């Protein structure tokens, strides 16, 4: 079993969504309607992507935000999510943060440059690429947006050191690349 499939199985088990583990991983194709879907999303000005970039993919994420108790307080540890389009797993999201294409192995790491709060959910984010690997879907990504977030907030209250909690969340992730010159 491939490492990507093992990861999909682990995330699906964590979410209790066994059907995700059965998703086929054939040739990737970003749907032509992705940009149209994105136009319907209200994006706060603070997390808008700078001019000179074009959206190359809009994917729906289902996963967990994992927190760990350290010195009696909850702190963020890592995300684990499967990003899909029309029910087909295309990208894995994990600690770094990093996003990796399950089809071509390309990846992007990024750092947060802006945040917009969301009631009862993790914030919406604008992240700038800090590195890319390999040609393919994510090989030239310059910016990533996390939009339409639900859930994923840190646990509250007292905790025992070393304890972890994985909190389900969903979001839309928009991937952007520089406009060709």
Predicted regions span which residues?
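Primary mode marks residue(s) on the alpha4-beta5-alpha5 output face of response regulator receiver
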Residues: 35-64, 72-181
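C-terminal region of N-terminal signal peptides and the immediate post-cleavage residues
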Residues: 24-40
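Bacterial N-terminal signal peptides
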Residues: 16-26
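N-terminal export and membrane-targeting signals
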Residues: 1-18
């Amino acid at each position: 079993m491939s490492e990507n499939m093992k990861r999909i199985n682990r995330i699906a088990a964590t979410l209790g969504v066994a059907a995700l583990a059965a998703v086929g991983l054939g040739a990737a194709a970003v749907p032509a309607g992705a940009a149209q879907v994105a136009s319907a999303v209200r994006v706060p000005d603070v997390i808008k992507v700078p001019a000179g970039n074009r959206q190359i993919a809009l994917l729906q994420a289902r996963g967990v935000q994992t927190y760990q108790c350290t010195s009696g307080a909850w702190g963020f540890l890592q995300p684990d999510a499967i990003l899909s389009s029309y029910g087909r797993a295309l990208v894995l999201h994990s600690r770094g943060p990093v996003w990796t294409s399950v089809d071509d192995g390309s990846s992007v790491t990024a750092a947060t440059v802006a945040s917009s709060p969301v009631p009862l959910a993790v914030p919406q984010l604008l992240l700038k690429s800090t590195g890319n690997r390999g040609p393919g879907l994510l090989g030239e990504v310059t910016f990533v947006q996390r939009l339409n977030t639900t859930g994923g907030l840190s646990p509250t209250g007292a905790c025992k050191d070393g304890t972890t909690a994985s909190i389900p969340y969903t979001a839309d992730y928009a991937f952007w690349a520089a406009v060709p010159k």
